[in-house]
A protein has these predicted regions:
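Active-site glycine-rich loop that binds ribose-phosphate moieties when present
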Residues: 135-143, 163-189
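Flexible loop/hinge segments that line or gate small-molecule binding clefts
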Residues: 128-164, 286
Length: 296
């Protein structure tokens, strides 16, 4: 079994606590946490848990397992961490953990990576102009990525991710929509083993434009793109009004619902089942999954 790498995200947030708590019953011998060992020790003391750290020299070092056991591939903090107090001086540390995990996955040393929540504002204040894991990993892997959140009932993909609302329309083009749909279609086949994925696309505007009265994006961009994708053999319907896209019959019929922007899709799936929803990045040559909550 290939190794699974975990990054804890923002050191002053809940990520280190989750890493410690995971060691009590979920971590197995093939799981490695990439972090500063002192961070895990600090967290264990804070939440009153006993842990045993196995600090690795490299990815091929011998691993241990058992309650409280954590295999740690060390990356040193830039500055001492204070729980609950975000510090941009540790932004570089956060970036290093993500980069290391991604590179080890790219090189085949690990089968996938699980990421803890980051503070995007702290990273930017620390000099790293990134808007999120999804975009950063796409840059590392030199490819386009698509954010998808899923649980047992729903798979919701986003065409745009961390983009201000007044800028979203700039990203709604025939080419970009086509790229997003093709990534979803490919990964549903290859990673989820769905032979003929069915995708439902929402419109951008209220009522999916209402025949152009409430916006032209649907008639000028989305509808022609859907027709072209259908002609290429991709099973996609839409655009449909976002307010009815998540009716039970649609959730049952379609494998994925593609929304145009962040807050068009995420509130639905988080309301449905926040605790069991995970974030998966499609389009990457590696496997990356994440929690769907913030740094707390």
């Amino acid at each position: 079994m290939k190794k699974i790498l975990i990054t804890l995200g923002e050191p002053a947030g809940i990520g280190p606590d989750l890493g410690v708590l995971l060691s009590e019953k979920y971590l197995d011998k093939n799981t490695i946490i990439i972090a500063d060992p002192t961070l895990l020790e600090q967290s264990a003391k804070k939440i009153k848990r006993k842990i045993s750290l196995n600090i690795l020299d490299n990815i091929d070092s011998d691993l241990i397992s058992g309650k409280g056991c954590i295999n740690v591939l060390p990356v040193e903090l830039n500055i001492r961490n204070t729980p609950g107090k975000l510090n941009p001086k540790n932004a570089g540390y956060v970036i290093k953990t993500i980069q290391l995990a991604a590179e080890l996955c790219k090189q085949g040393y690990a089968g996938g990576m699980v990421t803890g929540p980051i503070s995007k504002s702290v990273l930017n204040k620390g000099g790293f102009k990134i808007s999120g894991h999804t975009e950063f990993l796409a840059d590392i892997c030199n490819c386009k990525s698509v954010m998808m959140l899923m649980n047992k009932k729903l798979k919701i993909a986003l065409h745009t991710t961390h983009v201000p609302l007044d800028e979203i329309s700039k990203y709604i083009t025939k080419r970009s929509i086509s790229e997003t749909v093709k990534i979803i279609n490919h990964d549903m086949k290859m990673k989820f083993k769905i032979k003929r994925p069915k995708i439902l696309m929402t419109g951008l505007n209220p009522h999916a434009g209402e025949d152009g009265m409430l916006g032209k994006h649907e008639s000028r961009i989305l509808e022609p793109t859907v027709r072209k994708l259908n002609a290429e053999g991709i099973l996609i319907d839409g655009p449909v009004p976002a307010d009815t896209a998540f009716l039970k019959k649609n959730v049952m019929e379609y494998d994925v619902i593609l929304t145009m922007f962040h807050d068009q899709g995420l509130p639905v799936i988080k309301f449905d089942n926040f605790k069991t929803t995970v974030n998966i990045t499609l389009g990457l040559p590696i496997i990356r999954v994440s929690v769907d909550h913030g740094t707390a």
